[in-house]
C-alpha cells in the first residue's frame, strides 16, 4: 500500500493533542484518536478529551462513538482506524493518529492478527469469579505459566486483557502471543512518519499534577456523579484512571484529598509505562516538548513531510 500516515505518540500530558492540531492545520490533515478511553461519550474531563470548540476546525475521529457500557477493544480499534486511514487518504487528506495507547497504535501499523474466536461463557464466568475472590494478580500468575511473553506485556491489573489471553489459550491451545507474532510477519502497510513527544520526567510529573488539579476545578466530580446517575457504575469504562477514584470518594471510602493523590500517583505511573512501551520502537523520532516549542516541532514535522512527498 502507498497510503500515507503520520503518528504522534507519547505519555499523557506531554502536549500530543495540541501538536496534532497544529500539524493537521498545516498539511490538511484529519486526526484519529489513538486513546482507548476517549471513545466514550459523557467522559470528557477525566479523559482530557479535545472538545469540539478546541479542535480549531480539524476533523477528529474515534471520539464519542460509544456509550460507557459498551465494550471497546484493540481489535475494534484496528478495524476502524484502518478504515479511516483509507478513507482519509482517498479524500486527498493525511490521517494523523494521535494518542498514548501503545498496543492500539501498534495494531494498526504492525498487522496483528485478532482472530475472532468464539468463547465459552462458562469458562469466562469461572475466570471472572476467580478474579473477584483472589484478585486479577491471581489470573496474571496463571497467564505467566502458559504465556510469559503476554504476561510481560499485559499489566497485572488489566483484567479484561488477562481473561482474553487465557481464553485464547483455552480455546486454541496456543498462547495469544503466538497470534501477535503471526500477525507481525507481513510487510508494513503504510508510508509512515512516526513521532514521539517526551520531556524531562520532573517537568512531566509537574504537568500531570497540574492537569489533575485542573480536572477537579473543571468539574470531574460532577462528571462522575452524572455517569453514576445514568447507571454506568458497573461499566468497564468507569474503571478508568480518574473515574474509579472519584467513585470511591463519592461512596465515602476515601477522602477527596486521597482520591486526588491516587489519581496523580497512578497517572504518573501510567506515563512511565507509556514511555517504556514507546521507547522500544526504533521507528519513532523523538522531540522534547519541554525544550522545544510545539510550533518549532510542527515546522520540523512539516519539513520532513515535504521531503517524503507527503504534501
Swiss-Prot record:
Cofactor requirements of the protein: Mg(2+)
Pfam families to which the protein is assigned, alphabetical: IPPT
Keyword Coiled coil annotated: no
Binding site for ATP: 10-17
Paired cysteines (S-S): none
Reaction(s) catalysed by this chain's protein: adenosine(37) in tRNA + dimethylallyl diphosphate = N(6)-dimethylallyladenosine(37) in tRNA + diphosphate
Keywords: ATP-binding, Magnesium, Nucleotide-binding, Transferase, tRNA processing
Region annotation Interaction with substrate tRNA: where it falls in the sequence: 35-38
The keyword Cytoplasm is assigned to this record: no
Family according to the record: Belongs to the IPP transferase family.
Function summary: Catalyzes the transfer of a dimethylallyl group onto the adenine at position 37 in tRNAs that read codons beginning with uridine, leading to the formation of N6-(dimethylallyl)adenosine (i(6)A).
HAMAP family: IPP_trans (MF_00185)
Subunit structure: Monomer.
Protein name: tRNA dimethylallyltransferase
Native source species: Carboxydothermus hydrogenoformans (strain ATCC BAA-161 / DSM 6008 / Z-2901)
Gene that specifies this protein: miaA
Amino acid at each position: 500500500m502507498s497510503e500515507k500516515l503520520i503518528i504522534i505518540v507519547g505519555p499523557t500530558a506531554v502536549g500530543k493533542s495540541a501538536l496534532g492540531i497544529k500539524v493537521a492545520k498545516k498539511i490538511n490533515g484529519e486526526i484519529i484518536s489513538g486513546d482507548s478511553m476517549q471513545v466514550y461519550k459523557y467522559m470528557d474531563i477525566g479523559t482530557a478529551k479535545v472538545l469540539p470548540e478546541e479542535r480549531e476546525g480539524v476533523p477528529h475521529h474515534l471520539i464519542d462513538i460509544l456509550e460507557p457500557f459498551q465494550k471497546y477493544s484493540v481489535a475494534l480499534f484496528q478495524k476502524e482506524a484502518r478504515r479511516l486511514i483509507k478513507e482519509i487518504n482517498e479524500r486527498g487528506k493525511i490521517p494523523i493518529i494521535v494518542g498514548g495507547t501503545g498496543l492500539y497504535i501498534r495494531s494498526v501499523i504492525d498487522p496483528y492478527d485478532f482472530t475472532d474466536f468464539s468463547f465459552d461463557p462458562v469458562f469466562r464466568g469461572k475466570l471472572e469469579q476467580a478474579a473477584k475472590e483472589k484478585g486479577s494478580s491471581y489470573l496474571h500468575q496463571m497467564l505467566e505459566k502458559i504465556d510469559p511473553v503476554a504476561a510481560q506485556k499485559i499489566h497485572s491489573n488489566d483484567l479484561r486483557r488477562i481473561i482474553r489471553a487465557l481464553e485464547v489459550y483455552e480455546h486454541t491451545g496456543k498462547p495469544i502471543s503466538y497470534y501477535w507474532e503471526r500477525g507481525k510477519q507481513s510487510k508494513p502497510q503504510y508510508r509512515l512518519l512516526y513521532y514521539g513527544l517526551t520531556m524531562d520526567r520532573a517537568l512531566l510529573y509537574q504537568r500531570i499534577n497540574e492537569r489533575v488539579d485542573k480536572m477537579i476545578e473543571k468539574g470531574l466530580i460532577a462528571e462522575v456523579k452524572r455517569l453514576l446517575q445514568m447507571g454506568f457504575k458497573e461499566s468497564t469504562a468507569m474503571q478508568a484512571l480518574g473515574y474509579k477514584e472519584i467513585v470511591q470518594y463519592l461512596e465515602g471510602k476515601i477522602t477527596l484529598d486521597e482520591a486526588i493523590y491516587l489519581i496523580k500517583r497512578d497517572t504518573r505511573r501510567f506515563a512511565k509505562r507509556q514511555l517504556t512501551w514507546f521507547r522500544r520502537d526504533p521507528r519513532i523520532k523523538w522531540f522534547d516538548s519541554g525544550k522545544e516549542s510545539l510550533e518549532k516541532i510542527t515546522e520540523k514535522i512539516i519539513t520532513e513531510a515535504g521531503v517524503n512527498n507527503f504534501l
